[in-house]
Amino acid sequence: MVLKELRQKRPLVHNITNYVAAQFVANGLLALGASPLMSDAIDEMQDLAKISDALAINIGTINERAILCAKEAIKHYKALNKPIVLDPVGCSASALRHDTSLELLKSGGISALRGNAAELGSLVGISCESKGLDSQDANTPVEIIKRVAQKYFVIAVMTGKTDYVSDGKKVLSITGGSEYLALITGAGCLHTAACASFLGLKKDPLDSMAQLCALYKQASFNAQKKALENNGSNGSFLFYFLDALSLPIKLENSLIKEVL
């Protein structure tokens, strides 16, 4: 299993992430078995690209400095042919986020793109509301994720109640998980960083992303079960989730299925 190899190799993941979730992302990567590196210092991007196994970019707390740093990092990781995962946080909400996401994608070098249905849909011109799709030309997340993968030549990862991953040809769905993931800050940010850690192992990218989604959902299910057993809620779930990521994860609640 990919998780076993991850814990043996402990890939170094460079994160340019938002400051709201930075600590949670670092702790989550450590729990999973990877090694986090958190830096947005533009002048050290070239040096960090040489020693890191993968790069995760999250535009959650976007500003001019973060944009310049992301561009500089992509340039050096691309030159070394190392995996880059982009999380276009909120790109369906503002022109700045949308345009920045497109600019980073068009610079080349992005290996995987992780977001929710609204974010990914906006990158291929499909309007998708949080309560469901309202587009006339695509009526399922399957169509959105396939288009994203094809248009930007990436592994597309859509997370939500059901996760979907695609390489532009095949589409896999991953069910299971916990509703509590939507009630804590940073769950998506950590998922993006975890994607980078798995891609850093240089295994089959589509299979790796599907396995990660399944493991992530199973860990959240395990954490919810533990929290409820102890009369807990959001707060205890967060801590049990980190615990669950660090323990052996047996897929019982999560199911990977080929849908296209």
UniProtKB/Swiss-Prot annotation:
SUPFAM superfamilies: Ribokinase-like
Signal peptide stretch: none
Gene Ontology biological-process entries: thiamine biosynthetic process; thiamine diphosphate biosynthetic process
Chain residues that bind substrate: 38, 186
Class of enzymatic activity (EC top level): transferase
The EC number(s) this enzyme carries: 2.7.1.50
Binding site for ATP: 114, 159
Cofactor section: Mg(2+)
GO molecular function: ATP binding; hydroxyethylthiazole kinase activity; magnesium ion binding
NCBIfam families given in the database record: PRK09355.1 (NF006830), thiM (TIGR00694)
Name of this chain's protein: Hydroxyethylthiazole kinase
Lineage: Bacteria, Pseudomonadati, Campylobacterota, Epsilonproteobacteria, Campylobacterales
Gene name of the encoded protein: thiM
